[in-house]
């Protein structure tokens, strides 16, 4: 399965009206890019040299050898230059090669190929002392065919691109540069080469993981990581990765990071100041990835031939109450370009979908009672509050709000867990295991007559709303007592609510 043409850059899988991700198959899946054909060390970045050095080609069993490249020169040597040596800048990376090392020769790589495969090539060429000429040859190793001839002066790099379809029966293809002529006539001088690409189209594979892997609770943080690997042969240009914040969660500010690959490190949430940002309006994180990526556009992701690990990004979300009892689903997408053809080809990739189950909301019950339903001003009333965690999960952050109404004065409080603050009316219970009950006893004095309603409201981090129970005490005025005792208010009371 190959990457698809981009219709809507940055577009992700659709979301249903219930907020669930309508996941689509991962495209392409790992190993789904077909045969990868790519040069090794196309920009001559290895081995690292200081100014210039002549090193053995890849046919030598020598740690100093140049990876990937071979030469027809009888001495088997390849010349590498560091950018800026003799005031000659590289065109790609920090190093480049000189085709004429100690003699006129051909530089090449032989690659396994499948007949019918479309390959793309790109190169940079420059003269050393003046105008130098070389030929690009592609074909079977015993008889490569000249595809193009390039002549460039020594003041700027020339850039060339093209396409090649592997003919029937050709299972090994040679990609070669043959020195034709060089200014000055010295066989050891001429024809600089850099930024060479030859291979299949880019093919970015996105692999997504969610940490932790198992069930989470409301309030937990999920870390999403997305790895992007270019399993094609050519580089993926203008790489843009996007990921919608899933329903039932909220983005954790400041959590954008490039874990590994180009431009690794933490990124700000704001747009236009580094290679990533969080778009609060659309609820989406955006990463510009690859070498040369900026705040405005994506960069270049090399083939896994040169960048085996690709690049990995990370961001975090917090599970909200709306996510309780459901699966938090997430899927990332990417857009990128194949810029090696006659016209740029816009491609898309989709990651695998992750699904993180969230525990259901905790059910609390609260019961409020009083030791009497009628009392006189000046008498004490004892209130009892019981809160129970009915499950199905443990509860955290359990609190009960029980503010004494006007007409009652707080005397004392005792509880089996946490403490009660009479100033705020808050009983901080804390964590409760499934099936646990905690109680609070409040002693209050009646200070004025009337119907005194006292309510207790319980909540927890995992509940979907508060639960309340209340009790009403009928407070009557305190009647004066006759001089010798007895009578209304002294032995049985009279009047009432």
Identify what each model region corresponds to.
Residues 2-3, 10-36, 199-497:
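Exported/extracytosolic protein signature
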Residues 19-118, 122-124, 129-139, 150-199:
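Aromatic (Trp/Tyr/Phe) and Gly/Pro-enriched flexible surface segments
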Residues 60-63, 69-71, 78, 97, ...:
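Generic hydrophobic, helix-prone segments enriched in Leu/Val/Ile
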Residues 96-98, 107-111, 147-152, 161-164, ...:
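Beta-strand-rich interaction surfaces with strong enrichment in secreted/lumenal proteins
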Residues 103-105, 117, 143-144, 436, ...:
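Short acidic/polar mixed-charge low-complexity motifs
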Residues 136-143, 243-248:
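Short edge-strand/loop segments of extracellular domains
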Residues 145-146, 160, 182-184, 339, ...:
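Sequence/structural signature of outer-membrane beta-barrel proteins
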């Amino acid at each position: 399965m190959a990457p698809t043409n981009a219709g809507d850059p940055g577009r992700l899988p659709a979301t249903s009206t219930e907020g669930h991700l309508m996941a689509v198959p991962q495209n392409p899946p790992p190993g789904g890019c077909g045969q990868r054909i790519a040069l090794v060390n196309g920009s001559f970045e290895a081995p690292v040299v200081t100014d210039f050095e002549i090193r053995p080609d890849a046919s030598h069993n020598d740690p100093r050898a140049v990876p990937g490249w071979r030469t027809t020169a009888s001495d088997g040597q390849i010349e590498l230059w560091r950018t800026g040596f003799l005031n000659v800048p590289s065109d790609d990376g920090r190093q480049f090669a000189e085709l004429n090392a100690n003699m006129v020769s051909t530089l090449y790589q032989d690659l396994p190929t499948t007949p019918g495969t479309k390959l793309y090539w790109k190169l940079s060429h420059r003269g050393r002392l003046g105008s130098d000429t070389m030929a690009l040859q592609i074909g079977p190793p015993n008889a490569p065919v000249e595809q193009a001839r390039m002549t460039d002066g020594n003041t700027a790099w020339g850039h060339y691109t093209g396409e090649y379809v592997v003919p029937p029966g050709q299972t090994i293809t040679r990609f070669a540069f043959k020195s034709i002529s060089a200014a000055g006539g010295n066989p050891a001088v001429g024809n600089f080469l850099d930024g060479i690409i030859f291979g299949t189209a880019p093919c970015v594979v996105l692999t997504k993981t969610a940490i932790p892997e198992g069930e989470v609770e409301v309030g937990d943080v999920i870390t999403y990581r997305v790895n992007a690997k270019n399993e094609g042969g050519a580089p993926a240009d203008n790489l843009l990765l996007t990921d919608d914040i899933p329903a039932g969660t909220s983005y954790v500010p400041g959590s954008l990071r490039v874990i590994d690959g180009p431009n690794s490190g933490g990124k700000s949430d704001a747009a236009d100041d580094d290679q990533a940002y969080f778009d609060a309006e659309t609820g989406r994180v955006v990463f510009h990835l690859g070498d040369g990526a900026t705040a405005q556009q994506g960069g270049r992701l090399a083939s896994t031939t040169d960048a085996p690990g690709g690049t990995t990004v990370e961001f975090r979300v917090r599970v909200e109450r709306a996510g309780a009892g459901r699966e938090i689903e997430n899927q990332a997408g990417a857009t990128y370009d194949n810029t090696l053809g006659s016209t740029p080809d816009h491609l898309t990739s989709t990651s695998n979908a992750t699904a993180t189950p969230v525990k259901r909301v905790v059910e609390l019950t609260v019961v409020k009672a009083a030791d009497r339903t009628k009392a006189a001003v000046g008498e004490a009333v004892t209130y009892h509050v019981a809160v129970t965690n009915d499950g199905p999960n443990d509860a955290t952050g359990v609190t009960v709000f029980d503010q004494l109404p006007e007409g009652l004065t707080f005397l004392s409080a005792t509880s089996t867990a946490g403490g009660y603050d009479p100033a705020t009316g808050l009983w901080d219970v804390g964590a409760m295991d499934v099936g646990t009950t905690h109680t609070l006893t409040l002693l209050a004095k009646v200070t004025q007559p009337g119907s005194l309603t006292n309510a207790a409201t319980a909540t927890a981090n995992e509940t979907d709303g508060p639960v309340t129970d209340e009790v009403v005490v009928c407070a009557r005025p305190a009647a004066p007592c006759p001089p010798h005792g007895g009578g209304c208010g002294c032995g049985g009371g009279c009047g009432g609510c």
